[in-house]
Amino acid sequence: ALARNWQRSVFYQLNLQEAAEQFAGHHLPLPEELPQDAPLMTRVNDAMFRSRTLELEGKTEAAHEQEARAFGQMREGLLEQAYHRQSPHLSVYADQIVWGRSPVRIDLAGGWTDTPPYCLNEGGNVINLAITLNGQPPLQVYIKPNKEQYHIILRSIDLGAMEAVTTYEELRHFNVVGSPFSIPKAALALAGFHPDFCRERYASLEEQLKAFGCGLEVTLLSAIPAGSGLGTSSILAATMLGAVNDFCGLGWDKQEIGNRTLVLEQLLTTGGGWQDQYGGILPGIKLLQTESGWKQTPLVRWLPEHLFTDSEYRKCHLLYYTGLTRTAKGILAEIVKGMFLNRTEHLELLRQMKQHALDMHDAIQRNSYEEMARLVGVSWKQNQALDSGTNPPAVQAVID
């Protein structure tokens, strides 16, 4: 009855994991699907509830269809924030190169509260800091005009890969996880080099580049392995968007670049939140806060850096590479499902994480190294509680 009368009930605010178990366990028929004029996030919750119920009933294929619908609808809501078509125009001289560089990020508290759909419903709080490696920003992008050919050349120094993009169709093939050039293709599309995002209309990519005045040569360098847990992919995407912004005179500020990075990751179907890109493109240590809603633009509160830079504390911090990597997509998918289903244990932990970020903010403001260190330990336990893969045996062996 609650499900049938969803407009006047709290059904979609309940623990939908438990509801799915009740429906499947008692062989109850699923309620009618929600109409298209229902709130988008409610339809997202409905699709994931159906997916979980069908999965428990052993109807795997139908469950996967509903799960894909849930993620697709959330993607739709986030992409609506970026459907402002662009008019890229050449903003550099023929012999100029745009060079974008970014640090990576470490989050100290509140990680995961930046992830949709949690942040869309409740907002998020994250404390993170931008870091260089050996004094150099490890993520770099170079863009220069190509006057000889009216197409786009993509190169990766660290991967030793190269690809020539000559058509809109080739540029649109960016949602293949693991492709070396998914990020630059999606960034160029968002910048207006694809009909879906361009104000003008052209018969082909070649025609658009002729009107633009040149082809493009894009070179990427990532001095950090993907899957290292430092926000590499998101920050590389933000760096690419920033470089394209300068090259094409798009007029985006850092907040807009951060927002479009969130959209780019939805285009790639990798998902993800906002803390990685803002952690990298905004320097120093900061508290990032958002409110509920589809537009996730963080308020930035800068924090003093004494506990990280003063001589008495610098040796207390160590960044250690374990050699273990994980791609974010699979990790995100499982945790996001719990958010969709309003799983009580997930939501309670995320609320604790959100408050924990404010506690960390106070400790750093008070310049208390002991309290900050204790709270980092709390962050570690919270991350393990939410994601069991955070601390595999090989990592625990390093700690021991």
Regions found by a protein language model. Name each.
Residues 187, 226-228:
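Helix-loop-helix module between adjacent transmembrane segments
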Residues 232, 253, 345, 349:
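Conserved acidic
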Residues 247-254, 297:
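Inter-helical turn/loop segments and adjacent helix faces that build the functional surface
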Residues 1-210, 221, 259-271, 277-400:
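C-terminal nucleotide
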Residues 228-250:
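DPxDG-like acidic metal-binding loop motif
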Residues 214-220:
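Flexible, acidic active-site loops/lids enriched in D/E/S/T/G that coordinate Mg2+ and/or position polar
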